């Protein structure tokens, strides 16, 4: 990692310092991809969220994995903001895209056990409907 940019990031955020101390290996892997220099597309964010969680069936592991992913992305966004590598509109869009992706995967993860326990959600017209969050 670029030492000067890292110092700016750590001075800007105690949270970034904490995340680095816990998840340094992940952060170095993430940094190796693009040095946190490029914005993430909506598709990239959805892909990384889905791919990180797709093989997990245990709720505890799933929750831990999404929390780690959130911390990694937050570190990236703090880095980009502290080093003036991202504008406010792009940062806001990426945060929003991550929230949307997290809701989608959480809904998909929760649906199977809910259907097994309660059956498919059915509307007043007796047609199966999507689980609404």
Specify the residue positions occupied by each region the protein language model found.
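Non-catalytic regulatory/linker segments of enzymes
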Residues: 1-133
């Amino acid at each position: 990692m670029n030492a000067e940019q890292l110092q700016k990031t750590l001075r800007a955020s105690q949270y970034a310092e904490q995340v680095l101390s816990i998840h340094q290996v992940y952060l170095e892997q993430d940094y190796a991809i693009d040095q946190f220099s490029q914005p993430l597309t909506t598709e990239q964010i959805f892909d990384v969220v889905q791919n990180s969680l797709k093989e997990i069936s245990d709720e505890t592991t799933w929750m831990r994995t999404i929390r780690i992913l959130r911390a990694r992305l937050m570190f990236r966004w703090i880095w980009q903001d502290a080093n003036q590598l991202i504008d406010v509109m792009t940062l806001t869009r990426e945060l929003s895209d991550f929230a949307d992706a997290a809701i989608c995967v959480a809904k998909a993860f929760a649906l199977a056990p809910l259907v097994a326990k309660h059956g498919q959600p059915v509307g007043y017209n007796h047609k199966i409907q999507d689980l609404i969050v």
